[in-house]
Amino acid sequence: MNTGRRDPVVTVQGRSTEPTYEVRGGLEGDVFPVFANYASFQRPTERETGTVTVTVTNSTDSLVRNRVAVQVQGWSDQEIQVTEIAAGQVRKLLFAPTFRARLYQNREITAATALVSVTDMGGHEVFSTTVPLRLRSADDIYWGANFEYAQFIASWVTPHDPRVEAVLSRAKELMPGRRLPGYETWRAPGVQEKTTLAQVKAIYRALQRKGVSYVKSSSTMGAHVNADVTERVRMPHESLGHVSANCIDGVVLYASLFENLGMDPVIVLVPGHAYVGVRLAQDSTQFLYVETAVTGRLPFEVAVKSATAGMAKYSESQIIRIPITQAREAGIYPMPASSKEAQSASVDAREANQNSLP
């Protein structure tokens, strides 16, 4: 990822007749799980970012063929790339080995080591080194300068989380006919909009009855600690498990609920705050916006008015909109839940279904 910052570098200089290798790890050594997960879905040749970058400089007068292997010991699978570098050329290889579930269980900054090994095509090792890494909490998002990585907040939108589905089971009990149909495209747009409004209100009331309330908690630690670029964001299962959320936590929770229903959610960032919106009908250009921070204490109608009034204070140039559908099309998928979290959420979901609202 090109952030304009100087990353830690490990360089080993060979003789002038041999290639040289330079290894960089993360962002100043920090590995954010959201970026690692995104890059691991991509083919190496399509990546613009990686967990580990290996730069091969062929200072010889002949073609060099290498087999390069990278693994974060104890945390990831091994990724192997085979490359050819023409005489006098430089090749940058971006590695994003698939991480094991424990990375997504991690809630504190943790030290790790990347092992890099290079062999020739005959299997002889020509270079090896280790690079220290700091694995960030799975909750940490790096917004970047001017929120250039804001689209990655879509990884916190987890529509198929069992706890999200449990909320929807409760919300449908508050709907006429006990249905949450999402968009019914065969209906007239005006009817769709009324149905969407009713569904969003039912979800809001279900979260109120569950006791979800606002709690400010966004501190994080690491090399990137500027509150303007790095923030802790709870996953929806955490917010529901602790029945507490700050504004951005609530936004990704609501967006998860909307996406589960096949609706089109949008996350809206303004200076110092965030709102969630949902398209009123499938082909509509109109969105319904909600102030999620007041879920625990104010009626739904007030939450809608508060969001509309809050957004009206800013010019379009100050507003960042992140349509979740577009993020998915760009390859930004939900971060995986650990097996422990999934099991706990499934138990909660079963209990919720057994105790649905009357």
Feature-to-residue mapping (PLM):
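A structural boundary/capping signal
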Residues: 2-358
